[in-house]
Amino acid sequence: MNESTVYECLKYGNENINRALEVLRAGKMIQIYDSDSREGETDLVIPAKAVTYKDVKWMRKDAGGLICVAVDPVASKQLKLPFMADLVREASRTSESLGEVVEKDGDLKYDSHSSFSIWVNHRDTRTGIPDLERALTIRKIGEITEKSLSGNGIRFGNEFRTPGHVALLRAAEGLLDERMGQTELSVALARMAGITPAMVVCEMLDDESGRALSKENSKDYGKDHGLVFLEGQEILEAYMLWTGSEC
């Protein structure tokens, strides 16, 4: 399917998706809700390359969850980013206690495996935790993701150190054909938008209940702040159009 046909499919398929893609191309924030049958959580989502310290502050104060960067599966391979569970599994060969805590089949109630990779700071940071420093680390993750996809030879360790304060998430190789987490949903949107597929995600939490912010309250927040609210199913349907599976 050529680009113009894909554009027409998306243009007339879902106006909400079209708005979200335009917002992401402008480097701004949107909301993504995965599904009622999965985590049942809404994330604030923004392209990594566009993040400022004010965005980190916004996510930290208004969302309250972990501030993570979801990385495209092709870039993850190029950068040799491991899954955290695999690292712990390897380390458990010499540490029995690690073997007891590493993620096992059936541990997760919402999916088959976690997408967590390593936690990093950029080497130009001091402690890595202030909003300015986390924003720097996040932008640099976006930049190195873009470089890795352009075929440039890159050594991830030249720019980053671990442990750090920004969690990396490895998107599943098959993206939405394989997994419907916020990681894959945000990276799929980045691909559709034609932007670097490194996306910041942060769960929205509820101060009153101590749980994830409900879908309705998340929508209300979005309306108050002018954010596009997307659900996982509509992203999946648009992604199927974009990949040419349906049109």
From Swiss-Prot:
Cofactor binding, per record: Binds 2 divalent metal cations per subunit. Magnesium or manganese.
Binding site for D-ribulose 5-phosphate: 38-39, 43, 179-183, 203
Top EC class for this record: lyase
Pathway it works in: Cofactor biosynthesis; riboflavin biosynthesis; 2-hydroxy-3-oxobutyl phosphate from D-ribulose 5-phosphate: step 1/1
Binding positions for Mg(2+) 1 per the UniProt entry: 39
E.C. number(s) listed in UniProt: 4.1.99.12
GO biological process, one term: riboflavin biosynthetic process
Transmembrane feature ranges: none
Subunit structure: Homodimer.
Protein name: 3,4-dihydroxy-2-butanone 4-phosphate synthase
Species the sequence originates in: Methanosarcina acetivorans (strain ATCC 35395 / DSM 2834 / JCM 12185 / C2A)
